[in-house]
């Protein structure tokens, strides 16, 4: 209960906290896992992964450094070792990034994504993204350099707080389609060349076709989902020229279509709500068709109990 006792108690507390922090760092530094990843990349890609020896040496050197610091902190209770922990963590993360991002399959430089705060911007599983139009969102289309930290770039941010999403990157990697508040737009990956492509009714969820035309969803039919008493309009697949002209409806389904994407064989994969031949009513089947809308048929999911819904085909 005196000053000396209080000082001793503080010392024990600080030692306990230091030991806990060091143990957390030690648990996060999984060197065997990184060695396994390096061995897999080296054996799998061989000449396409030329820095294997360099990374092995760096891992060995880091392991010695980490063991020395952990010993000093946990056995000798060296305060300097605790101070060095943040730098050790940064070195570990840099080593992980270098080893894993040298994967030859990661042969691109930037990641394109939608950044959204507050709300995920998700609908119920039977609805289309037209249900998001008119709602307030704090979101933008952005990109960052895969191999550089803190290098985020805003490509498009709407002037008003409205939905932006449904991004589809062009084959050349220089432009993209996206939807915002019922309009399909196109913009360059550098943020230039913004233009409206489809402005008819509620249009969203676009997809480039190899011949230059565009697929997209539209509720132009003005029919609605029957099991919610017509409370949600149905979006079906439509086709248009690159400039938005020549719009033609391809699907005439009772309920929504979603997420068109081009398969390697040139056909279009998409999802469709289906009441027929269904094991239960949560039914988003994968369908495929020719780009002109012909030969629509099931791809996967008819009479399959699990998974009961498929998203983002």
Regions found by a protein language model. Give the residues of each.
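Beta-propeller blade signature
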Residues: 139-145, 186-190, 232-244, 283-294
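Glycine- and acidic/polar-rich repeat regions and solenoidal domains
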Residues: 268-280, 284-286, 293-313
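Conserved beta-propeller blade repeats
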Residues: 111, 161-171, 176, 202-213, ...
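Asp-box/WD-like beta-propeller blade repeats and closely related beta-sheet repeat scaffolds
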Residues: 183-239, 243-258
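Short, conserved, GDST-rich strand-edge loop motifs in beta-rich repeat architectures
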Residues: 113-136, 216-233, 270-284
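Alpha-solenoid helical-repeat scaffolds
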Residues: 121, 137-139, 145-189, 198, ...
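Long amphipathic alpha-helical scaffold segments
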Residues: 2-20, 46-154, 161
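Multi-bladed beta-propeller domains
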Residues: 149-162, 188-202, 241-255, 290-309
């Amino acid at each position: 209960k005196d000053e000396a006792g209080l000082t001793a108690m503080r010392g024990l507390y600080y030692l306990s906290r230091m030991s806990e922090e060091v143990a957390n760092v030690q648990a996060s530094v999984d060197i065997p896992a990184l060695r396994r990843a390096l061995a897999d990349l080296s054996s799998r890609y061989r000449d396409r992964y030329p820095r294997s020896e360099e990374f092995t040496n760096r891992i060995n050197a880091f392991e010695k450094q980490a063991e020395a610091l952990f010993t000093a902190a946990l056995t000798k209770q060296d305060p300097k070792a605790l101070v060095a922990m943040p730098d050790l963590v940064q070195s570990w993360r840099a080593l992980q990034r270098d080893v894993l991002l040298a994967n030859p399959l990661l042969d691109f430089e930037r990641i394109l994504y939608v950044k959204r705060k507050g709300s995920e911007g998700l609908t119920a599983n039977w609805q289309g993204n037209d249900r998001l139009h008119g709602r307030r969102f704090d979101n933008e289309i952005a990109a960052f350099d895969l191999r550089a930290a803190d290098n985020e770039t805003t490509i498009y941010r709407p002037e008003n707080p409205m939905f932006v999403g449904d991004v589809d990157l062009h084959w050349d990697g220089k432009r993209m389609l996206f939807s915002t508040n019922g309009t399909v737009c196109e913009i360059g990956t550098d943020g230039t060349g913004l233009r409206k492509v489809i402005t008819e009714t509620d249009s969203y969820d676009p997809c480039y076709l190899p011949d230059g035309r565009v697929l997209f969803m539209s509720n132009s039919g003005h029919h609605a989902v029957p099991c919610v008493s017509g409370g949600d309009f149905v979006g079906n697949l439509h086709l248009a020229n690159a400039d938005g002209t020549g719009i033609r409806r391809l699907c005439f389904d009772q309920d929504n279509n979603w997420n068109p994407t081009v398969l390697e064989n040139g056909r279009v994969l998409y999802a469709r709500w289906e009441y027929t031949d269904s094991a239960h009513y949560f039914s988003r089947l994968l369908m495929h068709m020719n780009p002109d809308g012909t030969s629509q048929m099931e791809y996967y999911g008819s009479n399959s109990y699990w998974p009961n819904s498929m998203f983002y085909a």
